[in-house]
Amino acid sequence: MNNLRKKVLMMTMAAVTLSAIAQQPVDYVNPIIGTNGMGHTFPGACTPFGWVQLSPDTDTIPHNINGAYQKNAYEYCAGYQYRDKTIVGFSHTHLSGTGHSDLGDILLMPAVGDVKLNPGRADYPEEGYRSRFDHATEKAVPGYYEVILDDYGIKAQLTATQRTGIHKYTFPKGKDGHLILDLVHGIYNYDGKVLWANLRVENDTLLTGYRITNGWARTNYTYFAISLSQPIKDYGYKDKEKVLYNGFWRRFKLEKNFPEITGRKIVAYFNFDTANNSELVVKVALSAVSTEGAIKNLHAEASGKSFEQLAEAARTDWNSELKHFEIEGTPDQKAMFYTSLYHTMI
């Protein structure tokens, strides 16, 4: 009889504990709400009022094609459409709920197999680095996002601090992977949006650079510092802009293992030994001032902390803001309220 009472007591305590956890305001938020049609929201990771909004971009429609204005470009104000079947990559800045498009800065995309330096088309993803995905493997909660990139078998997990986006990529066992860094990509893109870009390899685990863009904000400077959990094996890039004179290069080629590059249409790749270590953690810090500022932000907010610690901290930050408001209602009503409140803080 005593054993039965103990079991009942333990089950009751467990139920109370689970109920208390489920009743946290952060658990009612659904970042997927608003991502279809003209809702103009994104499902990715960010913190309350943070600068970084790390989220998947499923496509972009140029502002104009051959001089003709494209009115459907505004469907991608936030870079993501729920109806889409492919992901181009993960960029670090997004607008939420606006009627205008911009940002989509510093896009990363992990991959295996042949290196492809163009995004490809949604109807033919094999021609580029984009990947198919399924919403069944997608998870979006405040401060955290994950998805399986079906074409590569890569699990992508994202979280964020105020000024840093953190990626965790798990590659298929036994396969070497690479990381694409696209400094051309943008939301509401058009030829000439990127005024200038720079990429510098500081060492085999640290990259720095910047890009200057015209958009809703003119001459917008975005500096970055990228920390890598694995050393780079080798790397290269492609400048998609036709240059009349490339200088006197003598016997070496700057397209591979360069120390520093600049241009307006830079897309780079970095190879890693993921066959022996399948996890790659990438921390990308931003600054509006300098690459030195980006490095300082990286050290201040993300250095020495695991992906899991940072994801839990982002969740805690969101719950701390949301719990200032207590409401009564059904679970659906609470989901509507706290998701709307969440969107006011992005």
Question: Where are each of the predicted segments found?
Answer:
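Bacterial Sec-dependent N-terminal signal peptides
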Residues: M1-Q23
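Accessory carbohydrate-recognition regions in carbohydrate-active enzymes
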Residues: Q23-I346
